[in-house]
Amino acid sequence: MIRRYWNINLKEMLETGVHFGHATRKWNPKMAPYISAKRKGIHITNLTRTARFLSEACDLVFDAASRRKQFLIVGTKNKAADPVARAAIRARCHYVNKKWLGGLLTNWSTTEMRLQKFRDLRMEQKTGGIHRLPKGDAARLKRQLFHLQTYLGGIKYMTGLPDIVIIVDQQEEYMALQECITLGIPTICLIDTNCDPDLTDISIPANDDAIASIRLILNKLVFAICEGRSSYIRNP
């Protein structure tokens, strides 16, 4: 895999607070190699290592995107939801940003049925079929459609398991991570100082609580994905 330059600089990461970890009492000792200092009871992440692993992750997703691989971005907590949706839409990736439904990947046949139901209801809505139903039935289907849009809207075009899953908060998305591990799907995780780097394939040490930090990391990754997709288009 060829190493590329992704314009990752320490000043930008400092300005967005990527280096701020959790309170020292909440740390995971496995994160010791990624921590450079303690400041006012908070662990400080080693940004040199963050830059290195982020660059490696960008190389990986570029290479995967250039081979038409499919990505799923997961981040369901409030601070991650909007950056995840924006990043995924920009890079034409699938995403989950509201709630991880148990078995979403490991019980894919059930997820496929839900997605088909979602597509059918969307078509009914577009063609006006729902509005021609009795008022009670129409209201029930509209509620069902709203529920499916909320939780499956980001994966409505997904036709199979993703090739790579990008996870914003390892602890918050532990169920998603476990499903990826079970299925052998490679993962890229933002890991804060309270996380376990051994659980993911590529760990990016970073503040997973600050919107600016999340946005910066995701922007670098989706830029690499977009570049990879462009590379495929230029060299099919």
From Swiss-Prot:
It is found in: Plastid, Chloroplast. GO terms for molecular function: structural constituent of ribosome. SUPFAM superfamilies: Ribosomal protein S2. Keywords: Chloroplast, Plastid, Ribonucleoprotein, Ribosomal protein. One of its GO terms (biological process) is translation. Gene3D superfamilies: Glucose-6-phosphate isomerase like protein, domain 1, Helix hairpin bin. Its main location: plastid. GO terms for cellular component: chloroplast; mitochondrial small ribosomal subunit. InterPro entries: Ribosomal_uS2, Ribosomal_uS2_bac/mit/plastid, Ribosomal_uS2_CS, Ribosomal_uS2_flav_dom_sf. The keyword Ligase does not apply. The keyword Ribonucleoprotein applies. NCBIfam families: rpsB_bact. Belongs to the universal ribosomal protein uS2 family. This is Small ribosomal subunit protein uS2c. It comes from Populus trichocarpa.
